[in-house]
């Protein structure tokens, strides 16, 4: 689907490619049963335009997000040593190892949110193996990333002082 890649979620467009004819028929039936098989009036044109004319924009976006990622990694390494950024290849969602904070990821996310207004997702909500990790979205303007990092630093300082009490 072009929706996340090109930031056109409001168009509610996606494509399904199913090579196996038996499975394709089952998918087709399910989509039609749920009445989600018909695109809105703009969806097809928007999707085609995104895929055929959005290459340069997407390259610039990837570069910008990569710079955001570098900014986050350097900031956390220098300013918030209690956290570690999990290495990743390609995503605008970063996983932060918060096992050094002395509380669960859920508790950390909640306390940081209460103290600073910064919303991070606790890894537990994504299944087994997510315990001890926070998820951070960096697909936003750099100023917002920097503001989020300042809030994160403040939240971690507060959380660490709470744990020491």
Residues covered by each model-derived region:
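PLP-dependent class I/II
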Residues: 1-165
């Amino acid at each position: 689907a072009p929706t996340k890649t090109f930031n056109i979620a409001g168009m509610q467009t996606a494509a399904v490619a199913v090579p196996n004819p038996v499975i394709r028929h089952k998918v087709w039936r399910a989509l039609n049963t749920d009445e989600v098989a018909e695109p809105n009036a703009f969806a097809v044109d928007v999707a085609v335009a995104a895929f055929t004319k959005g290459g340069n924009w997407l390259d610039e976006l990837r570069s910008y997000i990569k710079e955001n990622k570098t900014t986050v990694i350097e900031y956390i390494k220098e300013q918030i040593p209690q956290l570690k950024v999990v290495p990743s290849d390609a995503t605008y969602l970063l996983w932060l190892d918060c096992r050094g904070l002395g509380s669960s990821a859920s508790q950390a996310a909640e306390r940081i949110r209460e103290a600073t207004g910064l919303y991070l997702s606790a890894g537990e909500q994504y299944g087994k193996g997510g315990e001890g990790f926070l998820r951070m979205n960096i697909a936003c303007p750099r100023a917002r990333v920097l503001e989020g990092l300042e809030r994160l630093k403040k939240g971690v300082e507060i959380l660490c002082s709470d744990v020491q009490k």
